[in-house]
A protein has these predicted regions:
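Conserved polymerase palm-domain catalytic core
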Residues: 142-146, 151, 158-328, 335, ...
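Histidine-centered nuclease catalytic patch
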Residues: 179, 559-591, 599-609
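A conserved non-catalytic segment of reverse transcriptases
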Residues: 215, 220, 324-396, 403, ...
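Extended C-terminal regions of large enzymes
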Residues: 443-535, 638-640, 648
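Short cysteine-rich loop/turn motifs with clustered Cys
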Residues: 537-568, 590-592
């Protein structure tokens, strides 16, 4: 999980890379204007869209999970560009999906309960990704603003922030908790297709393809008549389409209700529209004040009185049954007074407590939130298991260093997510002592305190991210010279509301995204920690983390944001020339830059320089038709921190001096534009 991070850019960057962004922008703009779409399959079958889909799914860990045909992304990788495109286009002509592999995973802490997952074949997943990339901008323009699950640039933190706002600022202290019984397994296919038609998707061929996806055979069970398979790439989008109608129905009861007088609306700094004047007028009427916050199928309906909450409970129950053919779980659905009871949402439990007086003399209530008991019950055994892996790394099929990395990543992930709870320190402190005792009991003298390390001058390696976040903690421990993140060292961080200006499908919205690129993506950093490069030194893997933090998550040459799968660690002085794995000799670059550094063929060099937007004077190419000749005679005089450096390239007959970003040995004359 990421904290204070830039939004995930992988799909956005890939769309720009394959020149598909303009098409998605137009789909979004047309959908916002209420236009209908009749020829979407032609867009889905475009080579650019298919290439983009392949790039997006190949980076997922799930791409290595086989379907019923036993194939993974590895098999697709063996196909040529033309073969892959023609295969997808041929399947789209008359789409018949292969059977779906059914897998059951544990549901919650109850071992008797299982959650069924449907895993399509890798080719069907690729086609679903192609469809998703075209449908998503159309649907995004129609979705309600208070829906946060499975949508680009939105996450759990934004949903929690909206809940805080409704409870604390809007003083809506009664909540209707509704749990839909088996939502994903009971979606009505006919109703879903009609909802897509209402959204403007009038391409009958696409609707037939979607119907075929929904009715794909489940191996060993048969053909489903209802439900969307959990595990399919397109299922989250379709689930949002189903419940989008509920979002707008609830909004029509209060937020979107028309008024005779056009009240003034102002735009907040985060891009949201303030309707405070309209709401003030509505509160003077007998209308029921109601707002809804939804994350996937988990949603909260807030109101200002118990009577209104009871009415909304029964109205919503009837609406779900009549409109969407969905039933609620009577055991889990209820009305809660937030002044007296906690309400659970996204792993937290929340209520309001009195805290002073407001300006009008009334009692002021603020949000108090904890980690819910079920979530805490999962954390402790997981930590004990990770400590066991550190004690016996060979039994866990990983090295001691890898086991420590996995432990640290897990603890930092807990901190990153649950720091949104106001009482997170109180929740984690009780078993932080238990975890510390477990470390001491299992690892014994292998565990050292920071004081012992300093006093005995023991060698230790602390990645920059751990040093910055936990360096001042007395709870920090060391095992074999590696820092072990303390569980109890955490403080509350208020949830940050979503910036409504951000939008992946408008130029202005993408400009807002790019403003945030100077912050580090903790998800990528966690990935690097969790996946050290095997058969490389510990110094090498630790320096990867330090470099990612020091370079602000960007390529040292192009300045592009580095994403999982696109991070290459380059030795400035090659190892075969005596280069070491020390920090000064390493630099993180993207894949294209790394290919350019090691390229020797002039055509390949030109290709990558065009991709990266670099320029070489014509006179240079005229003089040196084959720059590979020069590559073996390159020496450098520069500093790592400098944006450019002077490079002296020598051969037997010519000397040339030019400025270039510092890359290292085998680098030819590269120029920035």
């Amino acid at each position: 999980m990421a904290t204070g991070k830039a939004q995930k850019k992988d799909k956005l960057r890939h769309a720009e890379y394959y020149d598909f962004q303009e098409i998605q922008d137009k789909l979004y703009a047309d959908s916002s204007k209420g236009k209908v779409f009749k020829h979407l399959v032609e867009i889905i079958a475009l080579p650019e869209n298919i290439r983009l889909a392949y790039r997006n799914i190949k980076k997922n860990h799930g791409s290595m999970t086989p379907g019923t045909d036993g194939k993974t992304i590895t098999e697709l990788a063996t196909l040529s560009d033309e073969q892959l495109i023609s295969s997808v286009q041929h399947k789209l002509d008359w789409y018949v999906p292969q059977s779906v592999r059914r897998v059951e995973i544990p549901k919650g802490n109850d071992p008797t309960k299982k959650r069924p997952l449907g895993i399509p074949t890798i080719m069907d997943r690729l086609i679903q990704q192609c469809v998703l990339q075209v449908m998503e901008p159309i649907c995004e323009a129609k979705f309600h603003d208070h829906s946060y699950g499975f949508r680009p640039n939105r996450n759990q933190q934004h949903a929690i922030a909206q809940v805080h706002k409704d409870m604390q600022r809007s003083n809506l202290h009664y909540v209707v908790d509704i749990d839909i019984k088996g939502f994903f397994d009971n979606v009505n296919h006919g109703k879903l297709l009609k909802q897509l038609w209402t959204m403007g998707i009038h391409d009958k061929k696409l609707l037939c393809i979607l119907s075929a996806m929904l009715k794909a055979e489940v191996a060993g069970i048969g053909f489903p008549e209802v439900g969307t398979p959990q595990g399919g790439i397109i299922s989250p989008l379709l689930s949002n389409v189903v419940l989008n109608e509920l979002d707008w129905w609830l909004a029509s009861q209060w937020e979107e209700i028309p008024t005779e007088f056009p009240y003034k609306e102002t735009v907040n700094p985060n891009g949201s529209v303030s309707k405070s004047h309209k709401f003030s007028a509505l509160r003077r009427t007998k209308l029921k004040e109601v707002t809804c916050v939804r994350y996937a199928d988990d949603f909260k309906i807030f109101t200002n009185s118990y009577q209104n909450a009871v009415k909304l409970f029964h109205a919503t129950k009837s609406w779900l049954h009549e409109r969407l053919a969905l039933e609620i779980s009577p055991e889990k659905s209820k009305v809660i007074n937030l002044k007296e009871q906690y309400s659970e949402f996204l792993g937290f439990k929340l209520k309001v407590i009195p805290r002073g007086r407001r300006s009008d003399g009334r009692t002021k209530y603020v949000v108090e939130s904890h980690i819910r008991e079920k979530s805490i019950a999962k954390i402790k055994p997981n930590l004990k298991r990770l400590i066991y892996d550190i004690e016996f790394p060979s039994q866990g099929k990983r090295t001691e260093y890898q086991a420590i990395c996995r432990y640290n990543v897990y603890v930092m992930g807990i901190h990153d997510y649950y720091q949104l709870a106001t009482k997170v320190c109180d929740d984690l402190t009780p078993f932080a002592l238990s975890v510390h005792k477990s470390l001491r009991a299992r690892l014994k003298e292998r565990v050292k305190t920071a004081k012992q390390v300093r006093k005995r001058k023991l060698p230790c390696e602390v990645p920059k991210v751990i040093r910055e976040r936990y360096g001042k903690s007395k709870q920090l421990r060391y095992v074999a010279g590696h820092a072990v993140v303390p569980v109890g060292y955490i403080r509350h961080k208020p949830p940050k509301s979503m910036n409504r200006k951000i939008n992946s499908y408008t130029p202005e919205g993408r400009a807002e995204i790019h403003k945030n690129l100077d912050r580090i993506d903790m998800t990528v950093l966690h990935y690097l920690m969790r996946n050290p490069v095997l058969y490389r030194t510990i110094e090498y893997n630790d320096n990867r983390l330090s470099l990612y933090s020091a370079q602000m998550g960007k390529c040292a040459v192009s300045g592009k944001v580095l994403s999982i799968g696109d991070i290459h660690c380059h030795h400035k002085v090659p190892r075969y020339l005596g280069g070491k794995d020390n920090y000064q000799n390493l630099v993180l670059v993207c894949e294209d830059v790394h290919h350019l550094i090691h390229a020797t063929n002039p055509d390949i060099i030109r290709k990558y320089m065009e991709i990266l937007g670099l320029d070489v004077p014509d006179c240079l190419w005229a003089t040196y038709r084959f720059p590979a000749v020069l590559c073996s005679h390159v020496s450098f005089r520069l500093s790592v921190r400098q944006a450019t450096s002077r490079v002296i390239m020598r051969n037997s007959t010519n000397n040339l001096q030019c400025k270039m970003p510092y890359l290292g040995a085998r680098t030819c004359h590269r120029y920035r534009k």
